[in-house]
Amino acid sequence: MKVSHIEHLGIAVKSLEEAIPYWENVLGLKCYAIEEVADQKVKTAFFKIGQTKIELLEPTSEDSTIAKYIENRGVGIHHMALACENIEEQLADAEAQGVRLNDKTPRKGAEGLTIAFLHPKSTQGILTELCEDKNK
């Protein structure tokens, strides 16, 4: 499997409205996009730090994965996303190496990226997202 860089860190928050001021006022970053990803039942806010982004994830439904994560673990880092090319190939390679896949088939994520998650039991306890920008 080949990845090029950390695309973003996903951080679970209860409220974007409450979380954004910390990133903007305390850290001096600018929120450049807010987007709802309906099929994942989340609303996201993005900040850029160098080549990497921070993605804040607010649940839009009590039965969303993020709402359940916050209920069980509290707010904080939810996942690490790694940029790659040929995501289908990367998933096949990961599976061939015994990595458990949350998503066997890539799907659409925020910012128009094609994404797939690897199970944390196979990735040293870190929920790992592969991201490909098919518009490049």
Show which residues each predicted segment covers.
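Long, hydrophobic N-terminal alpha-helical segment
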Residues: 1-40, 64
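Vicinal oxygen chelate
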Residues: 2, 6-14, 45-48, 67-136
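Short, structured motif recognition centered on aromatic/hydrophobic residues
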Residues: 6, 13, 23, 47, ...
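Hydrophobic side chains in well-ordered alpha-helices
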Residues: 19-22, 90-94
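N-terminal strand-loop-strand beta-hairpin
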Residues: 28-49, 53, 117-119
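A short beta-turn/loop motif at secondary-structure boundaries
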Residues: 37-39, 72, 107-110
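Serine-centered coil/turn micro-motif
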Residues: 63-64, 109
